[in-house]
Amino acid sequence: MNRGKALQLVKPHLTEHRYQHTIGVMETAIDLAKLYGADQQKAELAAIFHDYAKFRDKNEMRTLIREKLSQQDILFYGDELLHAPCGAYYVREEVGIEDEDVLQAIRFHTTGRPNMSLLEKIIFLADYIEPNRQFPGVEKVRTQAKTDLNGAIISSLVNTITFLLKKNQPIYPDTLATYNQLLLEQK
């Protein structure tokens, strides 16, 4: 699927702000794919569709997870996480993308997971550092991403985990497991 067609398919599902975010994620993912030797076309496609289900009805997504998806535990960790596994499902069913690499990158872009593929890492990080994102610590992660993909992911996870702890929010187990795995690999 070419870029124009993909963007045309995703745009009706997003607000203008989220569409601009998606463009930023796409451009960042392509840059990271070039830098780290990942498949640029897959990175582009996964980035374009990563938030495909972002604005779906929450009850509809909860029902989908309960009835058809394996990530049942995600239901206990906040509505912000639902769109990733549901997005992978909807992209397969509604858009017809069957490339499991692309679908996995969409599925885990919010939480991460241990043993992420290179493509999954790129989409996870591109979503965090795309140019429209402005929050404390993002510039450091952007700089780090140019030379150390895993280190940048660790930094993004530290920021996310710290943010959730300060808000007294639960942390999805795969997020902690991703942090632990990447940190232990660096030692």
Curated annotation (Swiss-Prot):
EC number(s) from the headed UniProt entry: 3.6.1.41
Protein name per the record: Bis(5'-nucleosyl)-tetraphosphatase, symmetrical
Coiled coil ranges: none
Assembly information from the UniProt record: Homodimer.
Record domain HD: where: 18-132
UniProt KW keywords: Hydrolase, Iron, Metal-binding, Nucleotide-binding
Lineage: Bacteria, Bacillati, Bacillota, Bacilli, Bacillales
Keyword field contains Ubl conjugation: no
GO molecular function: hydrolase activity; metal ion binding; nucleotide binding
Binding positions (ADP): 21, 51-54, 83, 109-110, 127, 133, 170-175
Alphabetized SUPFAM superfamilies for the sequence: HD-domain/PDEase-like (SSF109604)
Catalytic reaction equation(s): P(1),P(4)-bis(5'-adenosyl) tetraphosphate + H2O = 2 ADP + 2 H(+)
The keyword Protein biosynthesis belongs to this UniProt entry's keyword annotation: no
One Pfam family in the UniProt entry: HD
General function of this protein: Hydrolyzes diadenosine 5',5'''-P1,P4-tetraphosphate (Ap4A) to yield ADP.
Gene3D superfamilies: Hypothetical protein af1432
Family of this protein: Belongs to the Ap4A hydrolase YqeK family.
Top EC class of this enzyme: hydrolase
Chain sites annotated for binding Fe cation: H21, H50, D51, D127
